[in-house]
Amino acid sequence: SGRCYASICCVYESVNDKEKSFSGNDNQAIGLDFSPSKAYIDSYNQSALNYAPFKQEAKKHLAHLQRNLSRTKKGSKNREKARLRLAKFEEHIANKRRDWMEKETLRLVRSYEVIGVETLNLKGMMRFSHNAKNYNDVSWSKFVSLLEWKSAFHNCSVVKSDKWFASSQLCSHCGFKNKAVKNLSVRK
């Protein structure tokens, strides 16, 4: 997109080398369930704060820029200008998503000692779904990797559940497995 970046590498010693311990309070643990429209739903049935489907919000302007690019003649200066405008706008969308992820993951690791997340087969989910664009827009794997990275610097642990664990069918209080619940909008 026509921008230059500088990278600086530093080596530092961690001051916080104490052993991670769990206090045992129920309000210090949270589970996150993936949601294509709201990023996640936590174990208290709350959706992510300030989440907006970034690419879906900007799809009209994105389509306009893509049309402008496709209408220009290949090899022309106007095509290069249109390509740069499109690249800058896509970078803007990515920066908004990254900024939201950084702020939300930091809020979560500062607020909770244990964060449970589900491991998903996103490639398989995107292959057979009409929600593939939403799955891609949420960028769940990047969100989880940021959680893991930030939890190393705070007194927090990230626990991943198995890919095939029926977390949506289990009661969070008593552990009863309701096999009749296949509708993912029912989260009780």
Predicted regions and their residues:
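Positively charged, helix-rich recognition surfaces that bind polyanionic ligands
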Residues: 2-188
